[in-house]
Amino acid sequence: RLAFSFVNDAIQLAEGQTARSAIADHNRRVWKSTHNVDFSRYSDAEMIDQIEYTVFPNFTVWPTIVAPLVYRFRPHGDDPASSLFEVWMLFPAADDGTQPEAALEYRLKTNEAWASVKELGAYGPVIDQDIPNLPRIQKGLMASRKKTVSLGNYQESRIRALHETLDRYIAGEYPI
């Protein structure tokens, strides 16, 4: 089953209907047909928005219907310059209790595109857009003359909080 694919059929707005509610209704119909779940009780935000939560220290989840993604970053042995990046898709159980078929683990080869993983649907190319940034980010982090990282006040506040929490664990302020 595909995670998500763009549908070519046009969405028609009813008189007085907003584009947002029309897209949410469209998603409810598409996902009902592909997952056998009645999504009528879900809000428009749950059907459209890309809500993201990061769980300390390396786990990001999008608890939404349209993008049921989970990212997990893990150490790659003892190499601080590399890591393992996992992407999971978590689909809901059908209304009759039938569970989605479990996916087989697939490991990309070096330089293999995420877009080549058909199960990711339209999300493979989205991940591919972000991956080329990682080596430049890593290189920039290592190149600082002041040997520290300057973080933005708002956009990178979660990174700052993550490292402050790590420092507290290392200092023994939090139980392990």
List where the protein language model places each region.
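C-terminal catalytic domain of Rieske-type non-heme iron oxygenases
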Residues: 1-176
